[in-house]
Regions:
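Cell-envelope and extracellular/periplasmic
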Residues: 1-219
Length: 219
């Protein structure tokens, strides 16, 4: 079972999880992209995770498509908005008697850095800073990392970002890589353009990621 905490539009209650997840959670001072959220892997992630753990999940949306890692560094509007939303969710749950068993961020980012030719070492260092700074500020125990896929027409373009993600998960015990499937979908015809995927692809990644996140928490 899953719920959404709407930190921007309705912060005084929980809503049953539905897609598009976070469709109206737009803050002009932070993450703001009206009309851009048309599909997601959140429901499949939550369903797969709760099937293994038996513990309900509360999700908080703060996703911004097409954003480079530099836009998420400590002190930026996106970073501050994400921390603000996470803290509001935690405060709401605690004030209403919920027991928070696990707290994590789910992260899937890097395609824009591939397009921008961000050097791998810069991307890796900035990503590590963003993830650990956010986890500390938001009280999250882990980062559930979903590896990005490939640009459909230039499949080598995102390899440095993928390699950086592999290294971070190998080196950092609190960064958990839960899916590598996105890079397989171009060959399966599951991309709708050079950058985006069809909903069955998101469902497959969400399901795999949810199962592996549950295995991490159940270990």
């Amino acid at each position: 079972m899953g719920y959404e905490y709407r930190a921007v539009t309705d912060p005084d209650t929980l809503h049953p999880l539905e897609e598009p997840f976070g469709v109206n959670e737009n803050d002009p001072a932070g993450v703001y992209e009206p009309g851009m959220k048309t599909g997601a892997m959140v429901s499949s992630f939550v369903n797969a995770c709760t099937a293994q753990t038996g513990v309900p999940v509360v999700g908080v949306s703060c996703a911004k498509g097409g954003s480079a890692i530099a836009k998420w560094l400590h002190g930026t509007p996106y970073y501050q908005d994400a921390v603000r939303r996470a803290r509001k969710a935690r405060a709401f749950l605690q004030a209403n008697g919920y027991i928070i068993r696990h707290s994590a961020m789910v992260w899937c980012q890097g395609c824009t850095d591939g397009d921008l030719h961000t050097p791998k070492d810069v991307y890796k260092a900035d990503t590590e800073r963003v993830l650990h700074s956010f986890m500390q500020a938001a009280g999250a125990q882990a980062c559930i990392l979903i590896q990005i896929g490939n640009q459909r027409d230039e499949p080598e373009l995102y390899l440095p970002m993928q390699q950086a993600q592999e290294e971070l998960a190998s080196e950092q015990g609190d960064i958990v890589l839960v899916s590598r499937q996105f890079k397989t979908f171009a060959a399966k015809g599951l991309m709708k353009d050079r950058f985006h995927y069809l909903q069955p692809a998101y469902n497959a990644v969400g399901t795999e990621a949810g199962r592996n996140a549950a295995a991490y928490w159940n270990r």
